[in-house]
Structures are given as C-alpha cells and as structure tokens.
Amino acid sequence: MIEVALGAGLGASVRYLITQVLKSKTRVFPWATFIINITGALLLGFLHSKITSSHILLLLGTGFLGGYTTFSTFQVELVTLVNNRKQKMMIIYLLLTVICGILAAYCGSWLGKL
C-alpha cells in the first residue's frame, strides 16, 4: 500500500509540473492532458510487459502512473469544449486521445518485450 501512495504523490506532482509548463503555451487544444495521458499509456504498456515484481508494478504502475494520468481532467476538458461551442475540437480531442492512447499502450507493450 505504501508503494501506491508514494508513487501516486510523485506522479501527481510530475503531472502538475508538466501542466504548468504547457498551460501557457496552449490555447484551445488541451495539450498537457493529452501528452500526459498518452505518455502514461505508453509507460504502463511497457511496465506490464517488462516488470514482473508486484511491488514495482504497484509503485510505478498503480501509484506513479495512476497519479500521473488523469481521466477526470480529460472528461472535464471535453465538457468545457462543448460548453464553449467547440464541438469539432471536442470530437478531435476525444478521438485522438482514445486512438493514440491505445496505440501508445500497444507500442509500450511491444517495447517492453524487446
């Protein structure tokens, strides 16, 4: 349990820093959340193919990547785009995130098997 808590705190802190850096550079498309969720999918795919230790998976997978990635922010950003009458951008964001997330997880899994 301590592995999850430590990893989650660190993952959330890294996510916050990345969001702050990218926040001022983006306007409409939520790049920070997109990049965070896609890199998280890639890393989780890699970990699940490469790591066999349950403690390391708890620390890095469930903990760090659980704190690093953010499904709830993704949902709120979709709703915000709709509320701001940016339906096309919402659809693009939704599709890109789902498709790229699946591809990233697959690539991470493939890389982990090398």
UniProtKB/Swiss-Prot annotation:
Which membrane topology term applies here?
Answer: Multi-pass membrane protein
Among the GO biological process terms of this entry, one is: cellular detoxification of fluoride
Q: TM segments?
A: 28-48, 56-76, 91-111
Localization, per the record, is: Cell membrane
Binding positions for Na(+)?
Answer: G66, T69
Alphabetical list of Pfam families matching this protein: CRCB
Give the GO molecular function terms.
fluoride channel activity; metal ion binding
Record-level GO cellular component terms: plasma membrane
Main localisation: membrane
Indicate the family of this protein. Answer: Belongs to the fluoride channel Fluc/FEX (TC 1.A.43) family.
Protein's name according to its UniProt entry: Fluoride-specific ion channel FluC 1
Q: Which organism is it from?
A: Ligilactobacillus salivarius (strain UCC118) (Lactobacillus salivarius)
